[in-house]
């Protein structure tokens, strides 16, 4: 276990805690959105950022759990802590859009976005948008959320002169994926489902998303960094749906896992520490720059994933669940393929070369998949 305490170039190690890596940092005047902030490392990240003076918007699936976490954090921090709790179900694109609209109604700037929430399911499950659940929750939901909040971040960093930071929480588990890295067919048709591979694919997608986003932001000359972190092996509620894994983690946890306070350290370091200023498109572990798999640095795969994700976020707004779900499986798949091809043509015409340059949404009447679409005051409202 000596490696756990060995400090890297940053001066920190795997044994460092979130409070230690942010000691002396003044976050007053900053606003952060943290997904999955009601428990685990998300909650600890929210607590430590609030401790440093950051106003934290806790994006949570369970509002009651979020409210309890908020109360506990505020009771602990002397002088109070600025915390808001908003509902967000990352498996539903409609919920992501509602969250973005609710956040916009707060009229807050946005300096830091931490895409922390994740799920590891035991069974093969589709999201309400028809996507494999790991991919929908761990990647697509965060992809859409990031794009919907990005214009706010651009305005904030421009007006304040302070670098914006996007932190995507991935995992060393990204190495457990398909031979081709991302098997796009499995996202729409998860036959032969393997939960570990599905999870690994979604975590690989987190890194690829980060890298492509970083490239786009650099090309635009925007002062926003995007980095990925591996929090380490932690016995968190991520495994609550996997009884065997939970038992295993409880058995060997004291040997191989780290505490919640240590698990949140790398996220807090990348989100707040001055050492990370100007660093973007990197993968961090143990509060230091680390090396992900070769697939994770595949620029062409990152572009393919970006286009695929964009097409799915655009395509779902045309679907009425009440009618679509009643169609035969072959017709549903044909419809999705046609929609993907249409969106690909839009992309080729240059309308969607970046996360901000999208066409206006088409006129719609009635409902849509997973709920009603709420128009957002951003140029990217087509998402």
Language model: regions and residue ranges:
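Rossmann-fold NAD(P)H-dependent dehydrogenase/reductase core
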Residues: 3-5, 10-244, 313-330, 343, ...
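C-terminal helical subdomain
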Residues: 96, 202, 228, 251-292, ...
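Intrinsically disordered, low-complexity proline-rich regions
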Residues: 359-363
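C-terminal tail/cap regions
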Residues: 1-20, 246, 274-343, 383
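Alpha-helical packing segments of well-folded alpha/beta enzyme cores
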Residues: 69, 99, 209, 263-267, ...
């Amino acid at each position: 276990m000596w490696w756990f305490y060995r400090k890297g170039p940053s001066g920190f190690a795997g044994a460092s805690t979130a409070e230690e890596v942010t000691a002396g940092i003044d976050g007053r005047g900053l606003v952060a959105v943290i997904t999955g902030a009601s428990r685990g490392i998300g909650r600890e990240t929210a607590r430590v950022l609030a401790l440093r003076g950051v106003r934290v918007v806790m994006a949570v699936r369970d509002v009651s759990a979020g409210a309890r976490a908020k109360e506990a954090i505020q009771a602990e921090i002397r002088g109070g802590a600025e915390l808001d709790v908003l509902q967000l179900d990352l498996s539903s694109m409609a919920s992501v859009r509602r969250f973005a609209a609710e956040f916009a109604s707060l009229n807050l700037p946005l300096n830091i976005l931490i895409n922390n929430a994740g799920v590891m399911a035991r069974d093969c499950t589709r999201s309400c948008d028809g996507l494999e659940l790991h991919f929908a929750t761990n990647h697509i939901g965060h992809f859409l959320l990031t794009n919907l909040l990005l214009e706010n971040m651009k305005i904030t960093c421009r007006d304040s002169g302070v670098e914006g930071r996007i932190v995507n929480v991935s995992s060393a588990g990204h190495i457990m994926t398909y031979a081709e890295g991302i098997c796009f067919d499995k996202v729409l048709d998860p036959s032969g489902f393997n939960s570990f591979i599905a999870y690994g694919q979604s975590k690989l997608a987190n890194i690829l998303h980060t890298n492509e986003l970083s490239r786009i932001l650099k090309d635009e000359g925007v002062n926003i960094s995007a980095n990925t972190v591996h929090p380490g092996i932690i016995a968190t509620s991520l495994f609550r749906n996997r009884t065997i894994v939970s038992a295993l983690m409880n058995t060997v946890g004291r040997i191989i896992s780290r505490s919640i306070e240590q698990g949140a350290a790398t996220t807090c370091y990348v989100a707040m520490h001055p050492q990370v200023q100007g660093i973007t498109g990197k993968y961090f572990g143990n509060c230091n720059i680390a090396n992900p798999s070769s697939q994770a640095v595949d620029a062409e795969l990152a572009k393919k994933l970006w286009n695929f994700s964009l097409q799915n976020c655009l395509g779902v707004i045309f679907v009425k669940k009440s009618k679509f779900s009643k169609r035969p499986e072959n017709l549903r798949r044909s419809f999705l393929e046609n929609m993907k091809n249409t969106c690909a043509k839009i992309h080729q015409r240059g309308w969607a070369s970046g996360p901000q340059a999208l066409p206006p949404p088409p006129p719609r009447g009635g409902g849509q998949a997973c709920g009603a679409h709420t128009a957002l005051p951003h140029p990217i409202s087509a998402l």
